[in-house]
Amino acid sequence: MISVVMSYYNRLKQLHYTLHTISNSQIKDVEIVIVDDFSDDGSKLDTLSKEFPHLAFNIIHMRDRQEKKTYCNPCVPYNIAFRASRGDKIIIQNPECCHMGDLLQYTQNNLTDSNYLSYHCYAATKSETDVLHTGQPMPMFTHKKSRWYNHVTDRPVAFHFACAISRKNLVELNGFDERYAIGHDYDDAELVVRIQNLGLAIEFVADPWVVHQYHRKTYDNPNNPPVAQNNRELYEYLQQNPQVRADNQESICGI
């Protein structure tokens, strides 16, 4: 089974289109694990199983687990999604990243315990996203170099806009490091470093790929100095003290 895991916050229109593209896959043995991260429209996720009856969903609401949000980094809901997942192959992605081609089939055929698949991710403008939602073909996209969030030559970051890893390796890594929970950024960069420390080959995939659908920002200044500085200092410290396994209170092994 393949598990597609997402941390969700107020991206319902984009999520719907992403699920539409996932539902076109030839692979049917798949589950969609979504952790709702205190979003305003989270209750609407509970109807997804009716809208996409051929997809298996596991919807987890953070409001059911704690009264208020005590973190600002998505590493926490992602780790919860990992623990809830059942697949032997895991696709980690943003809910607004729709599939251009059959990522599930490519993952099924090409993911091993020796590699990490990093799918190219193009950042669509609002007008491009609007056209995409009409079902028009992709050639209208500009594909400007500056608009790639992840690309083997233009921006080879290998972050989890859309990536795939085996369950065995995810357990070995113990997911994201939750020491980044109270700050912004660097959790994704640090995961890539630990993937390299584990000896996995990072393979950038140009086809199939994903499009990051445009959305308005729904938070206040994510780069405010104090929280950004906290995570930057932690990241720099961990580069001097390399490790493979995340230092989390709760193990991913429980999944």
Regions found by a protein language model. Name each.
Residues M1-T21:
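N-proximal low-complexity "stem/linker" segments adjacent to membrane-targeting elements
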Residues R179-I255:
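C-terminal catalytic/acceptor-binding lobe
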Residues H20-D29:
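Short, acidic, metal-binding catalytic loop of nucleotide-sugar glycosyltransferases
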Residues R65-S85:
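Glycine-rich, basic loop-to-helix element that forms the pyrophosphate-binding segment
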Residues I90:
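Short aromatic/hydrophobic "clamp" motif used to bind/position activated sugar donors
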Residues D36-T47, Q66, N94-C98:
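A conserved acidic beta->alpha catalytic loop
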Residues F82-R83, M100-R179:
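Conserved catalytic core of nucleotide-sugar-dependent glycosyltransferases
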Residues D29-S39, I60-D64:
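Short beta-strand/loop segment that forms part of the nucleotide-sugar
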